[in-house]
Amino acid sequence: LTELIRKAVQEVTGGIRSVSPAVDPGEVPDLSKVDLRAELAVPDPANAEEYLNMKARTPARLGVWRAGPRYRTKTYLRFRADHAVAMDAVFTDVPEDFLAANGLFQVTTRCTSKDEFLTRPDLGRLLDPDTVAALKSKCKANPQVQVYVSDGLSSTAVEANIPDLLPALLQGLKSQHIEAGTPFYVKYGRVGAMDEVAKALGSEVT
């Protein structure tokens, strides 16, 4: 009986004794580095050129295709990878050396941690007395425009854009003879914190 079962199993499995690895055991490629705008995912599109032109004009995930009712594995993994990048942007702090390199000193809202910043948005709109005092001592009073930087929900966006954006903005204001205040960085800041900043420094626009 045992021999019959063994033969039956061999017939069903086709006598397979070893299984080849499904993927190369080498380094797994970083899916987040793939340019989705240049990737043609739809099989046999009616107009491949226009499809790629449309994808090049938007960051939306167009034409990801499917396997039955589900996303393809590569599409799903790319979505998870992008989600991980977004999570890192939220939970990672802007490095102090980056602030120093861009001439920004740091103050903090009434939030004491990233968790509190995410769960208590009201505290991210408020400055404590020590922060207000620091701003008044380090910043120009009553400027026409007060420019400051804040992490909000993406430290990555700060690092990617501020080195180009901040100097251009300050130069543009100066060229129009608009007085700008001393730039600085607000950690754990919500949009409403600008009202507190304007009140502390007496700026016309923040």
Predicted regions and their residues:
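Short, low-complexity, charged amphipathic interaction modules
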Residues: 1-24
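Active-site loop/lid in soluble adenylation, ligation, and acyl-transfer enzymes
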Residues: 18-132
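Flexible, glycine/charged-enriched surface loops at secondary-structure junctions
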Residues: 19, 176-183
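A structural signal for small-residue-enriched, beta-sheet-centric alpha/beta enzyme cores
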Residues: 107, 180-206
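Active-site glycine-rich loop that binds ribose-phosphate moieties when present
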Residues: 127-131, 164-168, 186-194
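Glycine-rich phosphate/diphosphate-binding loops that line cofactor/substrate pockets in enzymes
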Residues: 134-143
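Short glycine-rich or small-residue beta-strand-to-loop segments that form or flank ligand, phosphate
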Residues: 144-157
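Glycine-rich phosphate/diphosphate-binding loop of Rossmann-like nucleotide-binding domains
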Residues: 155-177
